[in-house]
Amino acid sequence: MAKNSIRVRYAPSPTGHLHIGNARTAIFNYLFARHNKGKFIIRIEDTDTKRNIEDGERSQLENLKWLGLDWDEGPDVGGDYGPYRQSERRDIYTPLIQQLLDEGKAYESYRTEEELQADREAQKARKEMPHYEYEYAGMSEEEKQAAIDEAKAKGLKPVIRFRVPKDEVFAWDDMVKGHVSFNSDTIGGDFVIAKRDGMPTYNFAVVVDDHKMAISHVFRGDDHVANTPKQLMIYQAFGWEAPKFGHMSLIISKDTGKKLSKRDESVLQFIEQYRSLGYLPEAMFNFILLLGWSPVGEEEIFNKKQFIKMYDETRLSSSPATFDSDKLEWLNNRYVKDADDSTIMDLALKQLIKAGNMPANPDAKTIEWARQLINLYKRQMSYMAQINDMASVFFEEPEQVSGEAFDEINNDTAPVVLKEFAAQIEALDLFDSVEIFKVIKSVQAKTGIKGRQLWMPIRIAVTHEMHGPELPESIELVGRETALEHIHQTLAQLKG
């Protein structure tokens, strides 16, 4: 197949926000298209009207754009193969469903939900796999028609079921998993292709859409493997050529070793959550791509252009991918360190404002102070929201020094250092990091105390923390008045 005939799609359902797993599907399809100079299409699969949420589509597209993805066709940009929402394509589906009915490849089914549930319970009691039992089994055409007429007289509306071929093998060479095959007798019987309201089900609509939109390759999650034989049956029924399929491995939790579940609230799983915490989109793109795909060599950090150039679908792994939030934090920290100061300033300032640690409309003096603060913590932050906890000493009145920190300075030399340091910074004409550094050296010279016994009492007294960024810069941002107040409080505590 020529590269320019490659067409792939990401087809989200607006039943929720963009999940890590779905973002991975979008990224893999995007890179495959861009690497091969093909087309990347967005299609909204909104046939599940009961579960669609109000801002589902907007949120999906907005977060894809935030990750750095763009598309050639879609509901917002149009294209030659529209409409790009399934809810707007019923005029395409309806005659095709009727065609299958006319050809005897599908039929009306009036079995109620209660009857189907009773069937499932009986099958369970017999230790059988749940499956649809043909409701017209053993009936003559006259008896079948009588049953249909009776159902209609009761006001029942039918679903449309696809007539599954008996004992036939449906197979494909999966681009990730290798050769996969299913016997038609194992898929659960005749399946629904149109609901009672006439809306097509996923398995029918996706086949029609992929065919009509000339989709050449389908990359999707491993949970769609069981759908593939059903879709191949529909392709066969229409005499259409199926696209090539690639089913990506499951994503499992590092902590549980089990499939990442949307119900597991201990793990952040939605792109919007990471945006809200101030993660960088480039880092998220990089991290998500490594969930089931690996570049050649040891290096794992590249920009999007490099990933497009090197992308090779044969390096997709069939083994489960482990979601490791610690690795994500490490990776994002690498990107934070390399990001330009203005980007980090903008993102971190938003976090400070959101937490109430900065006014919504700070003046120039406050912004300059914030700039110094953010630069001070930039290399330590894994994501921007951490600035509020890391720099809490600048926003909250600290409690008394306690625990390990108090034990560290509860000695004879700490009061000597603190008294001398307080006296010298109080006498400074210019209170900045350069002068503060000079004072620390002067205290060392005057007291003969050096190393940890010198700077640890100063850090703990001023910031109430044992660790942190550069000490002189931290003290400058705390301010002379507050620094002296903290030192005197600590001295009183040590006397106590």
Swiss-Prot record:
Please provide, in alphabetical order, the Gene Ontology terms of the cellular component aspect for this entry.
cytosol
Q: What InterPro entries does its record include? A: aa-tRNA-synth_I_cd-bd, aa-tRNA-synth_I_codon-bd_sub2, aa-tRNA-synth_I_CS, aa_tRNA-synth_I_cd-bd_sf, Glu-tRNA-ligase_bac/mito, Glu/Gln-tRNA-synth, Glu/Gln-tRNA-synth_Ib_cat-dom, GluQ/Sye
**The keyword Cytoplasm is annotated on this UniProt entry:** yes
Q: Which residues bind ATP?
A: K262
- Assigned EC number: 6.1.1.17
Q: Which GO terms describe its biological process?
A: glutamyl-tRNA aminoacylation
Query: Pfam families in the record, alphabetically?
Result: Anticodon_2 (PF19269), tRNA-synt_1c (PF00749)
SUPFAM superfamilies annotated for this entry?
Answer: An anticodon-binding domain of class I aminoacyl-tRNA synthetases (SSF48163), Nucleotidylyl transferase (SSF52374)
Localization (cell): Cytoplasm
Per UniProt, the enzyme's principal EC class comes to ligase
**Chain positions of motif 'HIGH' region:** 12-22
Per UniProt, the keywords (alphabetical) are:
Aminoacyl-tRNA synthetase, ATP-binding, Cytoplasm, Ligase, Nucleotide-binding, Protein biosynthesis
Q: Where is this motif: 'KMSKS' region?
A: 259-263
Main subcellular localization, coarse class?
cytoplasm
> Among its keywords, does the record have Acetylation?
no
One MF term in the entry's GO annotations: zinc ion binding
Q: What catalytic activity does the UniProt entry give for this protein? A: tRNA(Glu) + L-glutamate + ATP = L-glutamyl-tRNA(Glu) + AMP + diphosphate
Checking PANTHER family in the record gives: GLUTAMATE--TRNA LIGASE, GLUTAMATE--TRNA LIGASE, MITOCHONDRIAL-RELATED
Similarity-based family: Belongs to the class-I aminoacyl-tRNA synthetase family. Glutamate--tRNA ligase type 1 subfamily.
Whom does it interact with, and what assembly results? Monomer.
What does this chain do? Catalyzes the attachment of glutamate to tRNA(Glu) in a two-step reaction: glutamate is first activated by ATP to form Glu-AMP and then transferred to the acceptor end of tRNA(Glu).
Protein name (Swiss-Prot/TrEMBL): Glutamate--tRNA ligase 2
